[in-house]
Amino acid sequence: KEFAELMNEKAIELGLTNTHFVTPHGLDDANHYTTALELAKLTDYAMDNETFAKIVGTKSTTIYINNQPRQINNTNELLGVLNGVVGVKTGFTNNAGRCLVTETKRNNMDIITIVLGADTKKDRTKDSVNLIEYTFSKYKMYNL
């Protein structure tokens, strides 16, 4: 509970007025909520932390428990597959559905896409790919 309070303090500091945390794990609770826009803002902030960015950008790694190796894999199906994807996080609860926050870097552009409430993993991935490809095909960076 104390950690969730710290999370709420950070949300206020970041100007996230439509976000409230109850638990650190994000499982369903009526008072635990956010918006796609505020998830994007939070992701932008979090990805500036090198340790966080490295963790969410790692496809797989081996950890040791009682001197026994155990491989853990990132559940973001786009990481290491779709050009420019550098992270971030999948999620699922019964109320939220299947969710995916993705950061992609291409052609001097850095975008964050948010998919919430997908029915299946396949839909979540397809919707994310469509958002990413649409954005990079329709928007360009210009020097002013």
Locate predicted features.
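Short beta-strands and strand-loop turn motifs
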Residues: T19-H25
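Short, charged, amphipathic alpha-helices and their helix-cap/turn boundaries
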Residues: E2-T19
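Asparagine-centered polar/low-complexity signal
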Residues: N8, T23, N74-N76
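Domain-terminus/edge residues, biased toward the C-terminal soluble/receptor-binding domains
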Residues: L16-T17, D28-L144
